[in-house]
Amino acid sequence: MNNSFIALCFITSIVTTNTAMANSTINKLDSPITQGVNHLGLTVPNLEKSTQFFTETLGWKVVGGYDDYPSKFVTDGKLFLTLWQVTNPSKSIVFDRKNNVGLHHLALSIASLNDLNSLYERCKNTDGVTIEFSPEANGDGPTIHMMIREPSGNRIEFSFTPK
């Protein structure tokens, strides 16, 4: 056997061993490296109507935005959303939750069953909101939830779980 072949085998075994050790270290974490959702960005064909939905129907606050890439930043004090205006609303494609990759829906917690029912009534009377289903048990319960599409078509689930 020549020395080059032996050296190649030796180097290959070192690289293989080091790679395996590195992969086992990378793949094993003692705790999650993430700390929750920082923010979520939703693309909308109608920035004004979507902003109104979050502020007027849900009571969120506008805390910023950009004019050059039309957007509004809204928050409920716990979650921060960026609403991004599509470039050409007439060419926007509605998300198909069964065939597209992407955000299936946003789920928001509601403090009480009364609040959930009140929100359902507000959504019924909000222009551009489509109700997919009214408050109902999620599976066998105890969670009660409802699903809507906000004025730009993004699906939002509202969920109350008794404590």
Q: Where do the PLM segments sit?
A:
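Bacterial N-terminal signal peptides that target proteins for export
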Residues: M1-A7
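Bacterial N-terminal signal peptides
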Residues: A7-T16
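Sec/Tat signal peptide C-region and signal peptidase I cleavage site
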Residues: N18-A22
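N-terminal beta-strand motif that seeds the catalytic metal site of vicinal oxygen chelate
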Residues: N23-E48, L103-L108, P162
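Core segments of cupin and vicinal oxygen chelate
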Residues: T43-T87, G139
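Vicinal oxygen chelate
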Residues: P45-E48, L106-S152
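A short acidic/small-residue loop/turn micro-motif
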Residues: G139, P162-K163
